């Protein structure tokens, strides 16, 4: 079946699909202060989703393309769940968030199929994969249309990997007590085995969202990158996120001695946002298997335990947390109680001495990750490094921060 036909089969025009903003039924606290964050984007009036321009541009999407798709959503006069929120159009049709981003992805998919130059075709496939992932954002459990977009993103990513420089292998890892999980091992040119970074992504992203990190930062230094999806999404959707947040990544780490392309004696973990919760747990529980752990905007304590901090977070992000925990119908009080159990300080880890070198990068006044969380991480490590990343100019400083983090990782791996 061709990719185009697969798209047509998955996205049959039906209007009974649940609309994304209705999937998590929590008590709404009403108006919230505007939020802006380098890693998560910003709240914009009349949008349910946070608009994450920096990360979308960093992944290769043209800013004009973002505005074009947003304009199509805004101009739609189709029925909405909430007339005040543009991105709540009901059903897979014009104006629906998933429809418009998937339609944009199909344009690039068609370009990829028509392009004869393999590398350029690979770029177009990668572009399509990124757009399908934005269509599925924020990846809430039970969002049928989003799951179909994720399937198309994975397919496009596999097509891209066959054409782009280096080698990518799709790998299956066995996890006792449940379904196996699938990861992608990205390898630079040259002969392995390679020093490898195990990527621990955020809760509102997919493992295929981090190709730019590999291509721009790790590959030029001869470092491989291994990704897996976080529990409850993508290829890890059959696994619920629990307080043992690092369970899947631990089983992957333990399997690395049997992967011939990976130098299992030179492995680091890198955690974005809640992925840092996973990475820091690994630093404590699997220190003999890790040379270093780096974190960026870590969610390890304050957001999980401080009610005032939770009140500053947009509804969409709280919906993501509730969805990952399988608490779609829980009260806000029940969600707060459960989130507290995910704090690595409450679990008795952070604050104890950890032998693994740990770096943590942060932005001042980050609503998701205050400086204190990063200080807690680095002060707990026998070899800690704190990295403040200035906010403006946001893109340049984000790139500079990633270069510094990669330098730090490279020194400990190579």
From Swiss-Prot:
Alphabetically ordered keywords of this record: Hydrolase, Serine esterase
Reactions accelerated catalytically: a carboxylic ester + H2O = an alcohol + a carboxylate + H(+)
Class in the EC hierarchy, top level: hydrolase
SUPFAM superfamilies to which the protein is assigned, alphabetical: alpha/beta-Hydrolases (SSF53474)
EC id: 3.1.1.1
Single GO molecular function: carboxylesterase activity
Role summary: Catalyzes the hydrolysis of esters.
PANTHER family, sorted: DIENELACTONE HYDROLASE DOMAIN-CONTAINING PROTEIN-RELATED, ESTERASE FRSA
NCBIfam families membership: PRK05077.1 (NF003460)
Family under the similarity heading: Belongs to the FrsA family.
Protein name, per record: Esterase FrsA
Organism listed in the record: Escherichia coli (strain 55989 / EAEC)
